[in-house]
Amino acid sequence: SPTDPNKKFTLEDAFALQRNRFEHLNGRFVPDDQIGVKKQGDDGSNDTVRKDQYKYALGNENVIDAHVYQINPNLPKSFGGTLWLGMGPSRNTPYVPFYGNLKDTYEAFKPQTATYDPNSWYWTVWHIDQMAINNQDLFGKSIQNHWKALEKQLIIEQKVSDAKYAALKADEAAAKAVEDKVTEDALARSERLFKQFKQYESELSATLKEAGRTDDPYRASLPDDYKDPTESSTEPSKEETKPSTEASTEPSKEETKPSTES
């Protein structure tokens, strides 16, 4: 590591790096996604914002899908290492491992909706991040700590899996033959975790509502410049209601009717 040459860089270090929001600098810098959001003084009345105070943190709101690729030389080449998938903003998202030889992915990874979708893995963890970052006084670091506890368990499980498949490194045919099993296990784990995420999302939303705060992920996922469509007017136009003041120059029917009298 940068501070200790005898310490190896771990997965947890990589996750922490991508979540970093200058917490270790004791207020020297503030993530620039907090401009106009977070006051730096007691009540904000005496704030003097330095020009260099706001910086772009690795855990910025715009850092999305910042995955971690783990190259393991002990695994068969066909496995392609391990991808620790971090969907959504890196600051408050869980990292979940997947081998590179999967034949299919879980259904929650497949929606491509542009706004919040409750059936989407991305939009679910995005919503959790939004609740965390917009209610720091209520949740603090609890959400990030929740993910860290999950990741600790996933790392343990992944080491067991790696050891099992490392035995196939010298036999590419055998490694190829287990791809269906690897895919099956990944789908089952994804389904289990997604159900947990949805439950956690629901619990956090309930906490906000109990605190009297609003939570509308559908509205929050719309573009910042989105404007609600105006209702179509049912009032008649001015042209329709304006009385005519011009005298008609067309002859009346009586004037144009030919005379039959002798």
Go through the PLM ranges and name each one.
Residues 1, 261-262:
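Accessible peptide chain termini
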Residues 230-261:
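Long, intrinsically disordered low-complexity tandem-repeat segments
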Residues 1-231:
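C-terminus-biased signal that marks the final domain/tail of proteins
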